[in-house]
């Protein structure tokens, strides 16, 4: 009861510590003095030796608390459960397993290990046919190298259609046009996460 909170075990107070750890995971750098190394560490070959170059191209991963839920018998009672939803965006070299482990390894999660459960959302909504195909709610990072044949084919097609210069353009516009098309990335998830991200089909 709220009149004697010391007799209870306040789940919201415990979650408050987890929330601060999640914020640190997103905002900290990766220096040796940090207990929680920030997600920016994946841009460093020390932490991501096989994929750091792709991670630098794509950008660092991020995490943010997007929802919080609790249960309590009433407004004048100690909360007996609390859960959060974390929106975690991955970069090259990360997997959903590594992302879950990062949360499990947060100091607050270890401190309250017997009370903490870290899991992934599952999609289980029925299709229009009524069929339910349960699957993990994660969207793997993917990248197509600029040197890949299908990417180069698109660049060649662009050159064939538009060239590299505009004969009618002034010098400033011509300079901006040089080297086009720009082969770059979007910094958010796309529909390619299943076809390319899971199955490697460009």
Segments predicted by a language model, with ranges:
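Metal-dependent amide/peptide-bond hydrolase catalytic core
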Residues: 2-202
């Amino acid at each position: 009861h709220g009149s004697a909170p010391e007799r209870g075990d306040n789940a919201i107070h415990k979650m408050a510590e987890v929330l601060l750890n999640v914020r640190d995971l997103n905002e900290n750098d990766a220096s040796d003095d940090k207990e929680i190394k920030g997600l920016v560490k994946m841009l460093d070959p020390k932490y991501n030796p096989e994929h750091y170059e792709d991670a630098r191209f794509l950008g660092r991963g991020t995490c943010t608390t997007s929802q919080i839920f609790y249960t309590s018998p009433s407004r004048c009672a100690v909360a007996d459960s609390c859960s959060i939803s974390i929106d975690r965006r991955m970069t090259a070299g990360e997997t959903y397993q590594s992302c879950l482990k990062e949360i499990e390894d947060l100091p607050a999660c270890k401190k309250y290990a017997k009370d903490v459960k870290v899991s992934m959302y599952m999609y289980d909504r029925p299709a229009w046919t009524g069929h339910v195909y349960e699957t993990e709610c994660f969207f793997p990072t993917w990248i197509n190298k600029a040197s890949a044949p299908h990417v180069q084919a698109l660049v060649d097609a662009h050159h064939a259609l538009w060239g590299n210069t505009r004969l009618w353009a002034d010098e400033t516009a011509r300079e901006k046009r040089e080297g086009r098309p720009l082969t770059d990335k979007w910094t958010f998830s796309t529909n390619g996460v299943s076809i390319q991200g899971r199955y490697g089909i460009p």
